[in-house]
Amino acid sequence: TADNPQAYSQNITLFDRKRGSGESIWDIKRKIGYVSPELHLYFKEGGSCFSVVASGLFDTQGLFKRLSEEQKAKVTHWMQVMGIDHLAERSFMQISGGEQRMVLITRALVKNPELLILDEPCQGLDRVQTERLKTVLDYLAANSEMTLLYVSHYDRDIPSCVNQTLELKRL
């Protein structure tokens, strides 16, 4: 996500800008939503699920700013879309792993990223959560300019909007 040192030794173009053209890591991260299997480990302080989702608006691991009414409405909207609005006031540390994953996916979506990177997003999700995620991603693919990079070990977890695949096989 642009903060890897290897990114600086390669000829990389992100969002139509060549590396070294004046963009900061924060400029790049602002355009990327990201979820990985270990992301929940960075939220040890907990806080409410609402604040974890809201932190996605600022690319922070915690909420350090007051939200405008518009930002609050956006967080509430995305929590409803993802079916987790009932978790808003619950502590992030006190919910199940699948619920944490849904909160973090919602955090990645709340800022409407140009690039959404989901690394094993269905890990820990039940069937209902998985289907909801796939439905939301299919809708976004059809109705937005967002690019989706989706990593999964299982074909059944891949949303139908994925139109290009790369399969890595062990030799």
Where are these regions (language model features)?
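Conserved ABC ATPase signature
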Residues: 64-67, 91-95, 99
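Catalytic Walker B motif of ABC-type/P-loop ATPase nucleotide-binding domains
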Residues: 116-120
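Conserved catalytic motifs of ABC-family nucleotide-binding domains
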Residues: 112
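Conserved H-loop
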Residues: 145-151
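Hydrophobic anchor residue at the start of the ABC signature
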Residues: 105
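Conserved ABC ATPase "signature" region
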Residues: 54, 69-87
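ABC ATPase NBD Q-loop/coupling interface
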Residues: 5, 11-27
